[in-house]
Amino acid sequence: MDNQEIKLLLIKKLNLEQANITGDSNHIKIIAIGNIFKNVSQVKRQQIIYAPLIDMIKEKHIHAVSIMSYTPEEWEKTKK
């Protein structure tokens, strides 16, 4: 599964406003932006993002993941 497919999967499954995926199957970096993260701890946010990817991780199609997650409001603040 390539980065574009991962992006579309996360957007669809998690109803994200935006997802940016970089890297390769050895290590992917995910920046996820969506209202699903409102009032959710960082640990729970990571669990939410891992859920649709878990089979790919188990099957070793993805080896390492770096996750950054934001609500739309948090994302806007990072851009200033």
UniProtKB/Swiss-Prot annotation:
Gene3D superfamilies in the cross-refs: BolA-like
Q: Which Pfam families match?
A: BolA
- Signal peptide location in the record? none
Q: Which residues cross the membrane?
A: none
PANTHER family recorded: ACID STRESS PROTEIN IBAG, BOLA TRANSCRIPTION REGULATOR
Q: Which family does it belong to?
A: Belongs to the BolA/IbaG family.
Name it: Uncharacterized protein BU385
Species per Swiss-Prot/TrEMBL record = Buchnera aphidicola subsp. Acyrthosiphon pisum (strain APS)
